[in-house]
Regions:
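A ubiquitous, low-specificity "background" feature that marks scattered single residues
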Residues: 8-9, 169
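Exposed boundary/loop context
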Residues: 9-10, 236
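Compositionally biased intrinsically disordered regions enriched in Thr/Gly
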Residues: 18-259
Length: 259
């Protein structure tokens, strides 16, 4: 009889544990902001369009949501003390206002040159999504695409990793032991050379990598389930023609450096 009671109690305990919410199960909703303005009142005038789709933490623990959302506002919009909706609306308004203010005088001079019209067709887009990361972390990814004149637009990926239990942003210093920089840079360089199929730094530079900079651990990284992926956007370690560079190291590769 005692065994039956014990088994029943254990079964109830296991069922209760299985219904506890997972750390990385914080729900998100999408905040949107859109704004478009034309440079002049002319029918065929160039325009600037801002489209922002930003994931916002909407869990049942306000302090965790606040920590995450404040970090998102700071990183994506360089603002403080605003909700994500307020920051997105403010950014869209300010961006389009500055577009008209700064470019209207220039366009007045170039208006007669049809070949230059495309230079004034601006856009700024942010799309975001989240995914579960290593050891219950929440990985927040923002894809930014903008054009502000010139030969081509710019695409960037911005990553934030959050401790799901606190909502605090996780940095490299939270992941690695003090003094990690030198060895981690060496591992990243080795992996980059392998990806580029070269055996020397000279060959790597011949492929336009690290032409005027030494290898370094990017603070733009993804704490994946099985590996850490370091993101280097265009112009950070290579020119536009090379594009975004991703370097992934397994946790076993950096085992001695992990906290």
């Amino acid at each position: 009889m005692k065994n039956i009671i014990y088994i029943a109690i254990m079964a109830m305990w296991l069922m209760a544990c299985s219904h506890e919410p997972e750390a990385a199960s914080i729900p998100f909703s999408t905040v949107t902001a859109e704004k478009e303005v034309t440079l002049t009142a002319d029918k065929d005038a160039p325009s600037c369009k801002v489209t922002l789709n930003v994931a916002c933490a909407k869990g049942d623990q306000p302090e965790i949501d606040k920590n995450m959302n404040q970090a998102i506002v700071q990183e994506l919009f360089d603002m403080e003390g605003l909700s994500i909706q307020q920051a997105a609306d403010s950014f869209a308004t300010r961006y389009t206002q500055e577009y008209k203010k700064n470019l209207a005088p220039l366009y007045a001079q170039d208006k007669s040159d049809s070949e230059k019209r495309a230079w004034y067709e601006y856009h700024y887009t942010i799309d975001t999504h989240t995914q579960s990361g290593h050891d219950g972390a929440i990985v927040y990814l923002a894809d930014v695409d903008y054009y502000e004149g010139g030969a081509h637009g710019i695409k960037q990926q911005i990553v934030l990793n959050f401790n799901a239990k606190t909502g605090e942003r996780m940095t490299l210093k939270d992941v690695f032991v003090p003094g990690y920089e030198v060895r981690l840079s060496e591992l990243l360089l080795e992996k980059l050379m392998k990806q580029a199929n070269v055996s020397s730094i000279e060959e790597l530079r011949a492929k336009n990598y690290l032409y005027a900079i030494d290898m370094y651990p990017s603070d733009n990284f993804i704490l994946g389930d099985d590996e850490i992926t370091f993101i280097y956007n265009i112009y950070e370690i290579a020119p536009y023609s090379v594009g975004k560079t991703e370097i992934s190291l397994s946790y076993s590769d950096v085992e001695d450096l992990l906290k």
